[in-house]
Amino acid sequence: MRLNCFILTVLLAVSCHGTAGTDMPEWRWPDKEEPAFVEPYPAITNLGWTNVTGAYSTLPEGIGIYRSPETLDGNKVIAYIAVADLSKVAWDVRSIDDPTIQGTTDPLKTPAEYYKETSAPVIVNGGYFFAEGGKRYNASVAVSGGRTYGVNINYASKDWVTMYYPTRGVFYEKDGARQTGWTYWSGGAKHYLYDAPARNSWSKDPLPVPDASFPVTAVDFAPETAIGGGPVLLKGGKVENTWEAEMFYGDGADDKMPEARHPRTAIGVTKDGLLILFVCEGRGMTDGVAGMTFAEEAAALQSLGCVEALNLDGGGSSCLLVEGKETIKVSDGSQRAVGSVVLLKKR
């Protein structure tokens, strides 16, 4: 036993002597360097927009968030865009269920409530809506997974004696293509899509009720995903801004709405297929920031490379959430409950 202990002691001594005072070997391989950040969309940052994607921690690959420069065309602005590579992320719509403008008891929800339900990384308010007699109504197209949840309202009147039948704007996806157009729902089985609007005006007599051949030859409207609103801002790379033809405003104070600055929301697509969700702050929530006119909104989206773009519900409805956090200050002071939202999600 004593012999074994002696041998063990000698071995330990030799071992310690062999390493005492000897430095550990140097690491022969350099530490791996983090790759340098490469801006994915320099055409956007070259316009003065700032990439703020790094402020968010859980965005899936394919989504970028950008903040506008302090001014656009001399106008003080606060605007944000979400840029989506649709090969990596998808866009979708959530809405109350009112496919025939008959109303529903479905509740309106704030974007934050939609976020709580979906955990979608990006959510923006969608189309027009209204509430009356204890029911909620869609006034704009809403389609998800090929199922219709809302149609564009198909009538307009100032006195409920003279009736107009406007075609109103839509942004839709079908067979991998995303574009704008104008729709009319007949009140029955027919839902028409047009490449041009009926050129109605409050200052003129009503045009005929849209059908398969008026205002231009129609196709059946059967998209996979769609959101309505209006006016159409861009089509085929050109500014449209068809607010008068779509009959959003009539006599009175609202006449100035298209040319006044307000919070705005829009959806568009570039010639390279990037989806852009746009929102701008307004109504003095930040000192000196009034918002944008339709024309200014169209110009901003065109400068960002959009070739198709649709204005969505704005004003107090305008709200863009990223990871559930507000970007602009909403003009109602708190988020408005809305009828529909557009969201981005990982494919």
Predicted features and spans:
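Conserved, well-ordered active-site substructure
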Residues: G133-V161, T242-E244, F248-E308, S317-R347
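Short glycine-rich loop/turn motifs
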Residues: V77-I81, R168, G228-G230, R261-A266, ...
